[in-house]
């Protein structure tokens, strides 16, 4: 079905949102907290955030999406949707149904037809649905941050929604590329930065460079409140002020 014709009802449905909430509360969150030792810091940075936004984490493990949906505050992920690789998660009906249930997902093609995926993502954002995007496009094989594509920043600018940077640490060690199961009781950290907006006249690539810089600083300084070498906030003065007043 063409993205332009696909209805958005299921992404906005209150009953489906409540069903996902129950699944996460009684299944996926207990499972993740049993398998992993997790710490989430920075909720104060996004307190009061409403409407659509784009969650942008680094990506180093198959655990990353489950950690975002299961470990971040419920109110932040209640309506969160994400694209899932069509060639991996949508080949079989059972797997696609579970993926949609757990992650409120929609299929994206990893090769070709990227415009259709961006079109669907933009439609959801305009409808008020927050989106999870991994701009690296694939998991890091070394655990180091890879090249972030600027598509999420372009959407943020065109739709007028903020990017919320998420720094994830420990996922690669818990379940690196090639592993079938995570290492039990591995320690993971999720640092939530404050919402970031493009500056006046700032292009998508420059904006994404600032987002990546903020994520790297959160990882290096092990805090959701990192500082640049000159003592300024990497999130921008306005973003930092919003976080302090929330």
Language-model segment annotations:
Residues 1-23, 115-246:
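Non-catalytic C-terminal accessory region of glycerolipid acyltransferases
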Residues 28-59:
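Helix-to-loop junction immediately C-terminal to a conserved catalytic motif
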Residues 28-29, 101-107, 135-138:
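Short, basic, glycine/proline-bearing loop/turn elements
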Residues 31, 75, 99-100, 124, ...:
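A generic structural signal for well-ordered alpha-helical segments
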Residues 36, 110-114, 145:
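A conditional alpha-helix N-cap/helix-loop micro-motif detector
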Residues 40, 55, 82-83, 190-192:
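Generic preference for hydrophobic
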Residues 40-43, 92, 115-118:
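Structural motif corresponding to alpha-helix initiation and N-cap regions
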Residues 48-111:
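Catalytic core of membrane glycerolipid acyltransferases/transacylases, capturing the structured
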